[in-house]
């Protein structure tokens, strides 16, 4: 059952903290949480808009840090469901990647070199940005795919994992 401590109808970090002793008493030694980062929640938080900000519906970054502290105090573990394959279209990286002028985020996502043509076995969006090309999406149209590169390139627009865009994506996700 959800523990809602602020009356908005959604379980939150403080609610989990209040139930930790009960969870421990059940014999659990770990808690696995759904994505709890800032998100427009078009897919239950799996469309992350900011990996460095807790979703306000669950609490603050300070509340999340306190949750970690309280969990560890009880010799338990906490696992956060990290979504490294895509972000939300609301993510600042994606907004920058959509710009026509090259910038540090241009190759952070997987873009084709043309808005025309059908991609085999890949969902994509076209006509949503200033730049030429379509962006590959994961699962839903509001989840643009992050670019980690392609080991077996079959298209000219696919980048190697060692190219600057994929390397920057990997380096940033390692910081998350």
Model regions and ranges:
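Conserved oxyanion/phosphate-binding beta-strand-loop segments in alpha/beta enzyme cores
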Residues: 21-38, 121-137
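Transmembrane beta-barrel strand/turn architecture of Gram-negative outer membrane proteins
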Residues: 71-80
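Acidic, glycine-anchored loop motifs typical of Ca2+
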Residues: 5, 9, 101
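Conserved Rossmann-like nucleotide-binding pocket used by diverse enzymes
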Residues: 32, 79, 142, 146
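Alpha-helical packing segments of well-folded alpha/beta enzyme cores
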Residues: 16-19, 63, 67, 169-176
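Aromatic-lined carbohydrate-binding/catalytic grooves of carbohydrate-active enzymes
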Residues: 2-5, 22-66, 76, 84-91
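Alpha-amylase-like alpha-glycosidases and glucanotransferases acting on alpha-linked glucans and related
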Residues: 88-176
């Amino acid at each position: 059952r959800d523990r809602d401590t602020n009356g908005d109808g959604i379980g939150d970090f403080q609610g989990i903290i209040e139930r930790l002793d009960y969870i421990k008493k059940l014999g659990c030694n770990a808690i696995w949480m759904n994505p709890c980062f800032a998100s427009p929640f078009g897919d239950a938080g799996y469309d992350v808009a900011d990996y460095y900000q807790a979703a306000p519906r669950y609490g603050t970054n300070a509340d999340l840090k306190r949750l970690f502290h309280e969990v560890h105090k009880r010799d338990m573990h906490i696992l956060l469901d990290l979504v490294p394959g895509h972000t939300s279209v609301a993510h600042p990286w994606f907004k920058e990647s959509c710009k026509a002028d090259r910038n540090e985020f241009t190759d952070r996502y997987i873009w084709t070199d043309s808005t025309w043509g059908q991609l085999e076995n890949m969902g994509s969006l076209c006509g949503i940005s200033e730049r030429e090309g379509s962006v590959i999406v994961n699962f839903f149209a509001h989840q643009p795919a992050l670019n980690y590169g392609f080991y077996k390139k079959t298209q000219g627009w696919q980048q190697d994992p060692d190219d600057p865009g994929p390397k920057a994506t990997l380096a940033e996700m390692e910081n998350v």
